[in-house]
């Protein structure tokens, strides 16, 4: 397993990442290979435009049913919308990971 040095976000989320307002992302196992203490480059998913850099703070397992208001607040989206988005991106996947990060200074 190699250490990931880049991460992509939907373009509509990148202003929240770049402002430091969005501090977590929920991904499946295939996108969970980030290492706390490393810096990664943030790109838009749609256009591969570099947005900023973030420092990975933690990578922790998370079951779909455990997604709650805290995660929604950190993701800057309402809980029902967050759950719907996660199900759309990762259909029928219960084993997820929450990646906590901060904007690189």
Swiss-Prot record:
Might you report a single GO cellular component term? cytosol
Key words, A-Z: Hydrolase
State any single GO MF term.
Answer: N4-acetylcytidine amidohydrolase activity
InterPro entries, A to Z: AC4CH, ASCH_domain, PUA-like_sf
**Which EC class heads this enzyme's classification?**
hydrolase
SUPFAM superfamilies xrefs: PUA domain-like
Transmembrane segment boundaries? none
- Its Enzyme Commission number(s) read 3.5.1.135
- The active site consists of 22, 25, 75
Q: What is catalysed by this protein?
A: N(4)-acetylcytidine + H2O = cytidine + acetate + H(+); N(4)-acetyl-2'-deoxycytidine + H2O = 2'-deoxycytidine + acetate + H(+); N(4)-acetylcytosine + H2O = cytosine + acetate + H(+)
Does the record carry Hydrolase as a key word?
yes
An example Pfam family from this entry, by short name, is: ASCH
Q: Where is the ASCH domain?
A: 8-93
What is the similarity comment for this entry? Belongs to the N(4)-acetylcytidine amidohydrolase family.
Mind telling me which HAMAP family this protein's record contains?
Answer: ac4C_amidohydr
What function is annotated for this protein? Catalyzes the hydrolysis of N(4)-acetylcytidine (ac4C).
This protein is called what? N(4)-acetylcytidine amidohydrolase
Source organism phylogeny: Bacteria, Pseudomonadati, Pseudomonadota, Gammaproteobacteria, Vibrionales
């Amino acid at each position: 397993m190699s250490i990931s040095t880049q991460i992509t976000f939907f373009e509509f989320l990148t202003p929240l990442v770049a402002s430091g307002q969005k501090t977590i992302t929920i991904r499946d196992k295939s996108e969970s290979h980030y290492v706390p203490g490393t810096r990664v480059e943030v790109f838009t998913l749609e256009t591969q435009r570099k947005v900023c850099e973030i420092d990975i703070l933690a990578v922790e397992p998370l079951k779909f049913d455990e997604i709650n208001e805290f995660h929604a607040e950190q993701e800057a989206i309402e809980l029902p919308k967050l759950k719907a988005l996660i199900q759309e991106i990762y259909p029928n996947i219960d084993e997820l990971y929450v990646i906590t990060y901060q904007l690189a200074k």
